[in-house]
Amino acid sequence: MYNDKIEIESPYGHITISYGRHNKHRVRVLDIDGGMESATYIEEELQNELLFEYMYLFDLMFDENYLEDRQINDVLLIGGGAFHYPKYFLAHHQGNIDVVEINKVLYDISNKYFYLEETINKFDKNKNRFHCYFENGRDYINRNKKKYVARVK
């Protein structure tokens, strides 16, 4: 099973799901048109942990040294990929996260292969902390009146 590749066509590119290792742990990888887009650990206890170093920079917005007496309750993420950061956010923070993803196929894949649905069920039982909007990110920002303390792209 872990040597298999899954190939999926979407309106926004050819998607490949494959398997590999990162620091001795099994991972599932999402590529779009040959470029790595996202990944997740397969072991249950690691599924909501960050795999990519740069994503820890996203989390600096929650560091008390950067907050300057403000609380981050609402975060907007443009582009969900395999929803790696939203899973981490739900598992490690108390606020709300909205994700704008133009490719609904990625959301469906994330639920099926990247543990998004399990994470939502575990950390957002009332279904009010995570929302996904399927549209162009710029259109969403231009149209939406909601104020976000943090926007991540």
Model regions and ranges:
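Rossmann-like AdoMet
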Residues: 1-66, 91-92
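The AdoMet/dcAdoMet-binding core of the Class I SAM-like
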Residues: 47-153
